[in-house]
Each structure stands twice: as structure tokens, then as C-alpha cells.
Amino acid sequence: MAEKKQWHETLHDQFGQYFAVDNVLYHEKTDHQDLIIFENAAFGRVMALDGVVQTTERDEFIYHEMMTHVPLLAHGHAKDVLIIGGGDGAMLREVTRHKNVESITMVEIDAGVVSFCRQYLPNHNAGSYDDPRFKLVIDDGVNFVNQTSQTFDVIISDCTDPIGPGESLFTSAFYEGCKRCLNPGGIFVAQNGVCFLQQEEAIDSHRKLSNYFSDVGFYQAAIPTYYGGIMTFAWATDNDALRHLSSEIIQARFLASGLKCRYYNPAVHTAAFALPQYLQDALASQPS
């Protein structure tokens, strides 16, 4: 039997992960990016951009459930939701499961990403692009949040790492724009990397977000193919009570929602805000 090809992630110089490639579905390498989607027997379809895993069919539900249900159930009565990025459609899929949400706006810089993912990652969106509450806006995320006349109850930044095209979604200009179009008591969340290996990223986001929000923190989830430990999500709001809701309140909202999840549950929600000591110490050592 011929040996299978291997794809190696290149995010870190001294260590990393690899995947056996059963079948390459798409590969485009240009001067600007290297995008590949391949099939792997253990993780299903895998999408990687510039040598970094973006999503896999097997474990994407963890990331998307935690990015969606934590802020929406903490808010409790969100009507208008903004997704920045999220072209694969899985974040949209999870938001559409909240029946009390009235409008979902997704801002994607490249229309081609949406059509591409609908073709190659259909399980991610699971038909959610056809939800009547959904509106797609083709625009730069920073420009949109600083120019739109709309306001939102929850903003989810489904961004790539802060290198290349994703870098602008970690800037003060973006955070200030999000504060501008967030309703009073609203919640902003964003992926912030694996804090054990990308701690400076979390510290930088915390410092910048603290200029615009009175309550800034993080919550976490374990996502196998985001190599290196626990994934960190930024959390920012002006209502500090939302990060400390009782488990009874979260449980009641969860039951009322009718959600059936594979990772998220009310106990996980509460526990996710418990941060490791090394991250607490790093945040505490920053100048006020």
C-alpha cells in the first residue's frame, strides 16, 4: 500500500501537528495565500490557510458552540447579532438555532469565501445561509463597524490569527468600531488563540479592549486541532454582571432555548471563565 501524503502545519517553528491526506479537494497557492481543503479519515474535511488549520468537520462544533451560545445565553434577550468573518457558515448555523434572534448580519471581506465554503464545507453551514433572518454584507470588518448605522446586541468576531489579512481585526480601530455599534449591555467576543503559546496576543487584546469596555476578560474551550492547549476567547461588555451570572440563570435560559449541543452546556459555560493562573498573572502584571 502506498504511503499517504502528509500535510504539516507551520504555525510554530519548533513543533506542530500533521494530518494524513486521503484526498485533496482543493488547493490554490498564489502570491497572497495558500488555501487547501483535504479529507482526513479522523477529522473529515480540513481547511487550512497559509499553513494553519482553520477548521475541521470533526471538531468545529466545539469552537462554534462556545463562540455563539456563551454570549447569547449570557445576554439573555439578544435580537440583533453581528458576525465578522465566519464565511464557512458554521457560526451562522449556531446563531440561527436561537429562535429569539431577529436579525443576523455577517460581514465577510470576500464573497468568494462564502460560495467556496458552501461547495466544499456544506456541513458547516447546514442550510443556514437560507435563513430569512440572515443578511450577508461584503465589506472589510473594520470599515463596517466604523460606518454602519445598525446596532447589535452581540458581536462575534470569527477572525483568523492576527497575521496577514486577519491582523486588522485585532486593532484598536476595530475594537472602537465594535463598541460604537454595540447596544448598551451588549457583548463582544472574539477568538484569541491558544493562550499557552500565544499569550501576548491575549494580553494585547485585553489592553486594547479595556480602553473601550469596562468589563474585559476571557473564557476558554478545548479544541483538538487548535494545537497547543486551551483556546482563548476574548469577552468585552459594559455589563459586568453578565460574566458572573448564576448557574441557575444559565440553566433556565438553556432549557428555555431548546438547544441540543454536543459540547456546550450550562456547567461548561460557567467553568469556561475559570482561567489558568499563568494567564491571570500575566494580565495582572500589565500596567493599569
Curated annotation (Swiss-Prot):
Question: What PROSITE patterns does the record tag this protein with?
Answer: PABS_1 (PS01330), PABS_2 (PS51006)
Top-level EC class, please? transferase
EC id? 2.5.1.16
What is annotated as the active site?
Answer: D158
Protein name, UniProt field: Polyamine aminopropyltransferase
Pfam family of the protein (one): Spermine_synt_N
Per the database record, which ranges form the PABS domain? 9-238
Protein's gene: speE
Task: Report the catalytic activity.
Answer: S-adenosyl 3-(methylsulfanyl)propylamine + putrescine = S-methyl-5'-thioadenosine + spermidine + H(+)
Which positions does UniProt annotate for S-methyl-5'-thioadenosine binding? Q33, E108, D140, G141, P165
Q: Which organism is it from?
A: Escherichia fergusonii (strain ATCC 35469 / DSM 13698 / CCUG 18766 / IAM 14443 / JCM 21226 / LMG 7866 / NBRC 102419 / NCTC 12128 / CDC 0568-73)
Question: What are this entry's molecular-function GO terms?
Answer: spermidine synthase activity
